[in-house]
Regions:
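Conserved class I S-adenosyl-L-methionine
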Residues: 1-43
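Class I SAM-dependent methyltransferase SAM/SAH-binding core
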Residues: 48, 55-96
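C-terminal lobe and adjacent flexible extensions of AdoMet/dcAdoMet transferase-like proteins
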Residues: 204-263
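A short SAM/SAH-binding and catalytic strip from SAM-dependent methyltransferases
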Residues: 104-120
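SAM-dependent methyltransferase
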Residues: 139-212
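A short glycine-rich, Lys/Arg-flanked "PGG" loop and its adjoining helix->strand segment in the class I
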Residues: 122-134
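A short acidic, Gly/Pro-enriched loop at the edge of an enzyme's catalytic core
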Residues: 96-106
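A short hydrophobic/small-residue beta-strand
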Residues: 67, 138-139
Length: 263
Protein backbone atom coordinates (compact mmCIF):
# COMPACT_ATOMS: atom_id res chain seq x y z
CA UNK A 1 0.00 0.00 0.00
CA UNK A 2 1.76 3.15 -1.23
CA UNK A 3 0.78 6.64 -2.18
CA UNK A 4 1.11 5.88 -5.89
CA UNK A 5 -0.59 2.49 -6.05
CA UNK A 6 -3.97 3.49 -7.50
CA UNK A 7 -4.99 5.82 -10.32
CA UNK A 8 -8.27 6.40 -8.49
CA UNK A 9 -6.56 8.34 -5.73
CA UNK A 10 -3.83 10.00 -7.75
CA UNK A 11 -4.00 10.74 -11.48
CA UNK A 12 -7.78 10.22 -11.57
CA UNK A 13 -8.57 11.77 -8.18
CA UNK A 14 -10.17 14.73 -9.97
CA UNK A 15 -13.01 12.51 -11.21
CA UNK A 16 -14.32 12.10 -7.65
CA UNK A 17 -15.89 15.56 -7.64
CA UNK A 18 -17.67 14.79 -10.94
CA UNK A 19 -19.11 11.49 -9.73
CA UNK A 20 -20.39 12.74 -6.40
CA UNK A 21 -20.85 15.97 -4.46
CA UNK A 22 -20.89 17.05 -0.81
CA UNK A 23 -24.64 17.53 -1.05
CA UNK A 24 -25.13 13.91 -2.14
CA UNK A 25 -23.13 12.76 0.89
CA UNK A 26 -25.05 14.95 3.34
CA UNK A 27 -27.79 12.52 4.37
CA UNK A 28 -25.33 9.69 4.97
CA UNK A 29 -22.93 11.94 6.88
CA UNK A 30 -25.70 13.35 9.06
CA UNK A 31 -26.51 9.74 9.97
CA UNK A 32 -22.89 9.27 11.06
CA UNK A 33 -23.09 12.47 13.12
CA UNK A 34 -26.20 11.22 14.93
CA UNK A 35 -24.64 7.81 15.52
CA UNK A 36 -21.49 9.36 16.97
CA UNK A 37 -23.47 11.59 19.32
CA UNK A 38 -25.83 8.80 20.35
CA UNK A 39 -22.99 6.49 21.39
CA UNK A 40 -20.40 8.87 22.81
CA UNK A 41 -20.14 9.21 26.59
CA UNK A 42 -18.78 12.76 26.28
CA UNK A 43 -19.81 15.86 24.37
CA UNK A 44 -18.40 15.61 20.86
CA UNK A 45 -16.71 18.78 19.66
CA UNK A 46 -13.63 17.43 17.86
CA UNK A 47 -13.46 14.71 15.21
CA UNK A 48 -10.55 12.87 13.61
CA UNK A 49 -11.49 11.54 10.17
CA UNK A 50 -9.12 8.77 9.06
CA UNK A 51 -9.03 8.03 5.33
CA UNK A 52 -10.86 11.27 4.58
CA UNK A 53 -10.32 11.17 0.82
CA UNK A 54 -11.58 14.22 -1.08
CA UNK A 55 -13.39 15.60 1.97
CA UNK A 56 -16.97 14.97 0.84
CA UNK A 57 -18.03 13.80 4.32
CA UNK A 58 -16.03 16.59 5.94
CA UNK A 59 -18.21 19.15 4.16
CA UNK A 60 -21.00 18.06 6.53
CA UNK A 61 -18.87 16.95 9.48
CA UNK A 62 -17.40 20.46 9.80
CA UNK A 63 -20.86 21.90 10.47
CA UNK A 64 -20.98 19.87 13.68
CA UNK A 65 -17.37 19.35 14.77
CA UNK A 66 -13.88 20.77 14.53
CA UNK A 67 -12.44 18.30 12.03
CA UNK A 68 -8.95 16.96 11.36
CA UNK A 69 -8.63 14.73 8.30
CA UNK A 70 -5.91 12.20 7.49
CA UNK A 71 -5.29 10.60 4.10
CA UNK A 72 -2.26 9.24 2.24
CA UNK A 73 -3.37 10.52 -1.19
CA UNK A 74 -1.99 13.96 -2.02
CA UNK A 75 -4.41 14.18 -4.94
CA UNK A 76 -7.43 13.62 -2.75
CA UNK A 77 -6.18 16.03 -0.09
CA UNK A 78 -5.73 18.77 -2.67
CA UNK A 79 -9.45 18.51 -3.47
CA UNK A 80 -10.35 18.29 0.22
CA UNK A 81 -8.39 21.41 1.15
CA UNK A 82 -10.10 23.40 -1.59
CA UNK A 83 -13.54 22.17 -0.53
CA UNK A 84 -12.95 22.53 3.20
CA UNK A 85 -10.39 25.25 3.99
CA UNK A 86 -11.57 25.23 7.62
CA UNK A 87 -10.45 21.64 8.12
CA UNK A 88 -6.91 20.63 9.12
CA UNK A 89 -5.58 17.97 6.75
CA UNK A 90 -2.57 15.72 7.35
CA UNK A 91 -0.96 13.53 4.69
CA UNK A 92 -0.20 10.22 6.38
CA UNK A 93 -1.04 6.53 6.57
CA UNK A 94 -3.94 5.95 8.96
CA UNK A 95 -2.30 2.76 10.24
CA UNK A 96 0.61 4.69 11.74
CA UNK A 97 -0.26 8.39 12.03
CA UNK A 98 0.41 9.89 15.47
CA UNK A 99 -0.95 13.32 16.36
CA UNK A 100 -0.39 15.33 19.53
CA UNK A 101 -4.13 15.78 20.02
CA UNK A 102 -6.80 13.45 21.32
CA UNK A 103 -10.29 13.73 19.89
CA UNK A 104 -13.84 13.31 21.15
CA UNK A 105 -14.55 11.01 18.21
CA UNK A 106 -12.72 9.20 15.42
CA UNK A 107 -14.50 8.22 12.19
CA UNK A 108 -13.48 5.84 9.39
CA UNK A 109 -16.61 5.83 7.22
CA UNK A 110 -15.20 5.09 3.79
CA UNK A 111 -11.68 3.65 3.74
CA UNK A 112 -11.28 0.75 6.16
CA UNK A 113 -11.60 -1.66 3.22
CA UNK A 114 -8.00 -0.89 2.27
CA UNK A 115 -6.83 -2.78 5.33
CA UNK A 116 -6.28 -6.16 3.67
CA UNK A 117 -4.60 -8.08 6.49
CA UNK A 118 -5.70 -8.62 10.06
CA UNK A 119 -2.48 -6.93 11.16
CA UNK A 120 -3.31 -3.79 9.13
CA UNK A 121 -6.82 -3.75 10.54
CA UNK A 122 -5.56 -4.15 14.09
CA UNK A 123 -2.99 -1.37 13.62
CA UNK A 124 -5.62 1.03 12.28
CA UNK A 125 -8.03 0.29 15.12
CA UNK A 126 -5.20 0.79 17.61
CA UNK A 127 -4.22 4.09 16.01
CA UNK A 128 -7.83 5.27 16.18
CA UNK A 129 -8.16 4.19 19.81
CA UNK A 130 -4.95 5.99 20.76
CA UNK A 131 -6.40 9.26 19.46
CA UNK A 132 -9.63 9.00 21.47
CA UNK A 133 -10.38 10.76 24.72
CA UNK A 134 -11.82 8.57 27.48
CA UNK A 135 -15.52 8.20 26.78
CA UNK A 136 -15.03 9.10 23.14
CA UNK A 137 -16.36 6.96 20.31
CA UNK A 138 -14.83 5.31 17.25
CA UNK A 139 -17.12 4.86 14.23
CA UNK A 140 -16.16 2.47 11.43
CA UNK A 141 -18.26 1.57 8.38
CA UNK A 142 -17.30 -1.75 6.80
CA UNK A 143 -18.35 -4.45 4.37
CA UNK A 144 -18.10 -7.79 6.18
CA UNK A 145 -17.62 -11.24 4.70
CA UNK A 146 -21.09 -12.46 5.67
CA UNK A 147 -22.71 -9.70 3.59
CA UNK A 148 -20.51 -9.81 0.49
CA UNK A 149 -22.08 -10.10 -2.97
CA UNK A 150 -20.32 -9.98 -6.32
CA UNK A 151 -21.96 -6.72 -7.31
CA UNK A 152 -21.43 -4.44 -10.29
CA UNK A 153 -21.70 -0.67 -9.89
CA UNK A 154 -21.98 2.23 -12.33
CA UNK A 155 -21.05 5.83 -11.50
CA UNK A 156 -21.53 8.74 -13.89
CA UNK A 157 -20.90 12.47 -13.90
CA UNK A 158 -20.02 15.38 -16.16
CA UNK A 159 -18.79 18.95 -16.12
CA UNK A 160 -18.65 21.24 -19.12
CA UNK A 161 -17.13 19.12 -21.94
CA UNK A 162 -15.89 16.26 -19.75
CA UNK A 163 -17.99 13.12 -19.20
CA UNK A 164 -16.99 10.33 -16.82
CA UNK A 165 -18.45 6.83 -16.50
CA UNK A 166 -16.97 4.32 -14.08
CA UNK A 167 -17.82 0.61 -14.02
CA UNK A 168 -16.87 -1.31 -10.87
CA UNK A 169 -16.85 -5.10 -10.53
CA UNK A 170 -16.44 -6.83 -7.14
CA UNK A 171 -15.09 -10.38 -7.17
CA UNK A 172 -13.83 -12.95 -4.64
CA UNK A 173 -11.21 -15.39 -5.93
CA UNK A 174 -11.35 -17.69 -2.92
CA UNK A 175 -14.16 -17.85 -0.37
CA UNK A 176 -11.59 -18.54 2.35
CA UNK A 177 -9.52 -15.42 1.67
CA UNK A 178 -9.88 -12.20 3.64
CA UNK A 179 -9.75 -10.06 0.51
CA UNK A 180 -11.73 -9.34 -2.63
CA UNK A 181 -10.95 -7.51 -5.84
CA UNK A 182 -12.64 -4.33 -7.01
CA UNK A 183 -11.81 -3.59 -10.65
CA UNK A 184 -12.72 -0.17 -12.00
CA UNK A 185 -12.93 0.78 -15.67
CA UNK A 186 -12.96 4.52 -16.40
CA UNK A 187 -14.47 5.90 -19.61
CA UNK A 188 -13.48 9.57 -19.86
CA UNK A 189 -14.62 11.71 -22.79
CA UNK A 190 -13.14 15.15 -23.34
CA UNK A 191 -14.92 16.96 -26.18
CA UNK A 192 -15.97 13.56 -27.48
CA UNK A 193 -12.49 12.02 -27.40
CA UNK A 194 -12.49 8.79 -25.37
CA UNK A 195 -9.81 7.64 -22.93
CA UNK A 196 -10.05 4.32 -21.07
CA UNK A 197 -8.30 3.50 -17.80
CA UNK A 198 -8.44 0.46 -15.55
CA UNK A 199 -7.62 0.28 -11.85
CA UNK A 200 -7.54 -2.88 -9.70
CA UNK A 201 -7.95 -2.63 -5.94
CA UNK A 202 -7.50 -5.41 -3.40
CA UNK A 203 -9.77 -4.82 -0.42
CA UNK A 204 -10.20 -6.46 2.97
CA UNK A 205 -13.13 -8.74 3.75
CA UNK A 206 -13.23 -9.93 7.35
CA UNK A 207 -15.94 -11.87 9.19
CA UNK A 208 -17.97 -10.28 11.96
CA UNK A 209 -16.14 -12.32 14.57
CA UNK A 210 -12.82 -10.74 13.59
CA UNK A 211 -14.28 -7.25 13.83
CA UNK A 212 -15.73 -7.79 17.29
CA UNK A 213 -12.53 -9.45 18.49
CA UNK A 214 -10.16 -6.73 17.27
CA UNK A 215 -12.34 -3.88 18.53
CA UNK A 216 -12.72 -5.51 21.93
CA UNK A 217 -8.98 -6.22 22.11
CA UNK A 218 -8.40 -2.49 21.63
CA UNK A 219 -10.34 -1.77 24.80
CA UNK A 220 -13.50 -0.59 23.07
CA UNK A 221 -17.07 -1.26 24.12
CA UNK A 222 -18.52 -2.39 20.80
CA UNK A 223 -21.95 -2.07 19.21
CA UNK A 224 -22.96 -2.78 15.63
CA UNK A 225 -25.72 -1.52 13.33
CA UNK A 226 -26.58 -2.59 9.78
CA UNK A 227 -26.76 0.24 7.24
CA UNK A 228 -28.66 -0.74 4.10
CA UNK A 229 -29.37 0.93 0.75
CA UNK A 230 -26.47 3.43 0.90
CA UNK A 231 -25.17 2.30 -2.52
CA UNK A 232 -28.37 0.93 -4.05
CA UNK A 233 -28.54 3.72 -6.62
CA UNK A 234 -25.19 2.65 -8.06
CA UNK A 235 -25.83 -1.11 -8.34
CA UNK A 236 -26.29 -1.99 -12.01
CA UNK A 237 -28.53 -5.01 -11.42
CA UNK A 238 -30.62 -6.52 -8.67
CA UNK A 239 -28.44 -6.85 -5.62
CA UNK A 240 -27.74 -5.63 -2.13
CA UNK A 241 -24.78 -3.91 -0.52
CA UNK A 242 -25.39 -3.76 3.24
CA UNK A 243 -22.70 -2.18 5.36
CA UNK A 244 -22.00 -2.59 9.07
CA UNK A 245 -21.54 0.44 11.30
CA UNK A 246 -19.34 -0.39 14.28
CA UNK A 247 -19.12 1.95 17.26
CA UNK A 248 -16.64 1.55 20.07
CA UNK A 249 -16.45 3.65 23.23
CA UNK A 250 -12.99 4.02 24.79
CA UNK A 251 -12.50 4.27 28.53
CA UNK A 252 -8.73 4.13 28.97
CA UNK A 253 -6.01 6.77 28.56
CA UNK A 254 -2.73 6.60 26.75
CA UNK A 255 0.23 8.88 25.99
CA UNK A 256 0.55 10.17 22.43
CA UNK A 257 3.62 11.55 20.69
CA UNK A 258 4.00 13.04 17.21
CA UNK A 259 5.41 11.62 13.97
CA UNK A 260 3.75 13.18 10.94
CA UNK A 261 4.45 14.38 7.45
CA UNK A 262 2.61 16.85 5.25
CA UNK A 263 1.73 16.50 1.58
Amino acid sequence: MTKTTWLTYNDLAWTDSLITSPEECKEETEYFVRTIRDHSRIEVQTLLHLGCGAGMNDYTFKRHFKVTGVDMSAGMLEIARTLNPEVTYVCHDMRTVTLEQRFDAVAIPDSIGYMITERDLRNTITTAREHLKPGGVLLIVALVREDFQENNFVYTGSREEVEVTIFENNYVFDSHQTTYEATLVYLIRRKGELEIFTDRHTLGLFPLGTWFSLLADAGLEVKQITMEHAYDRFISHEGEYPLRVFTGVFRKTRFLGQTNQQC
